[in-house]
From Swiss-Prot:
SUPFAM superfamilies per record: P-loop containing nucleoside triphosphate hydrolases, TrpR-like
Functional note: Plays an essential role in the initiation and regulation of chromosomal replication. ATP-DnaA binds to the origin of replication (oriC) to initiate formation of the DNA replication initiation complex once per cell cycle. Binds the DnaA box (a 9 base pair repeat at the origin) and separates the double-stranded (ds)DNA. Forms a right-handed helical filament on oriC DNA; dsDNA binds to the exterior of the filament while single-stranded (ss)DNA is stabiized in the filament's interior.
Protein species of origin: Shigella dysenteriae serotype 1 (strain Sd197)
UniProt free text on domains: Domain I is involved in oligomerization and binding regulators, domain II is flexibile and of varying length in different bacteria, domain III forms the AAA+ region, while domain IV binds dsDNA.
UniProt subunit comment: Oligomerizes as a right-handed, spiral filament on DNA at oriC.
Localization annotation: Cytoplasm
Entry protein name: Chromosomal replication initiator protein DnaA
Amino acid sequence: MSLSLWQQCLARLQDELPATEFSMWIRPLQAELSDNTLALYAPNRFVLDWVRDKYLNNINGLLTSFCGADAPQLRFEVGTKPVTQTPQAAVTSNVAAPALVAQTQPQRAAPSTRSGWDNVPAPAEPTYRSNVNVKHTFDNFVEGKSNQLARAAARQVADNPGGAYNPLFLYGGTGLGKTHLLHAVGNGIMARKPNAKVVYMHSERFVQDMVKALQNNAIEEFKRYYRSVDALLIDDIQFFANKERSQEEFFHTFNALLEGNQQIILTSDRYPKEINGVEDRLKSRFGWGLTVAIEPPELETRVAILMKKADENDIRLPGEVAFFIAKRLRSNVRELEGALNRVIANANFTGRAITIDFVREALRDLLALQEKLVTIDNIQKTVAEYYKIKVADLLSKRRSRSVARPRQMAMALAKELTNHSLPEIGDAFGGRDHTTVLHACRKIEQLREESHDIKEDFSNLIRTLSS
């Protein structure tokens, strides 16, 4: 049986799975084939359980398709593949890394075999300002399809800091939970190791600290502080744009931390390569570990967020009321929580029960603004402008991909962002049947799973239409 069997499986899995999933769960696996058994070694129990639950059938199916009745048995273990004298025994991934996956860079120093916790310089260290908010944990982070991968990656980093996903780069629009996950990772690391030096900050704080260090002739103390942390969590890294001196210092800090296996987590409102005003060498390093998008929450997640928030406030929120709010406010978690706080405050002040009619009254200006902003007409104009076509093309019978794909995108957005029925949406797109609209919605949902470009287009348009 060929020792390239696992490489064949990897190649097929890379074609079949979204790039981020492949990078996060499949790429870290090591494989060893012996005695008709294929042993897969996962870096930790979390990855092992996830792969076994989610991808066991996929892998077994591939083994059967390649080997037929001679397919090897699968065995999962936590750890690394035993080292042997035979070079061919190394059955590791050589599949080319896709755009959003972890990549090995020639410039990066080989990781130390010691844990990042052991590499921290001793004595004469400054007092660390953790700034981690203890209220933001994984337990109170509402998971949904839109943020599932981001949460899973953050959870794994908290369990194994300085490991495979270093740096971890989370990106997405405002109010989607990036900061919550940063704090959750910090809390997770400190729960496992209470004396860990975990520092959370906004990128502007890093800039301010550096400026102050330069003014006070204390740049060496600044370097020692930031390069001796166990985990550095920086929010809104895009604010480094056009700050050349800060970028220079962060570049060297970044390298020092990675060489010491100390964890870095960064967030931004956009994909690393799209951050203007940041040096290419930094943007390249941002993608060395794992880059994961957080999407605007889908309807079910928005409802779950509202119900959990109400429960935290000891408020009974009827399901139909949560659905009513979630259906109308779609842009981000912060907007949802703000609306619910407003409803709760009004209910407390008036002593009235929280019903749909009460919510309509309490949020009337917000709902009116939302309905005014997002109309099918507005969606069509925005999509046409985004794809550089005419609105008339969206309404036409043309079927070329350059028109059909934007038309499907516009239909999917109309279903997501308005309260119109499928027949009403079809009528607005040149009198099309409701089944055409349904097909368009399903097609875009499928493409968002398979294509980074489509996922980005959808997120960008949602953000534009909801802002």
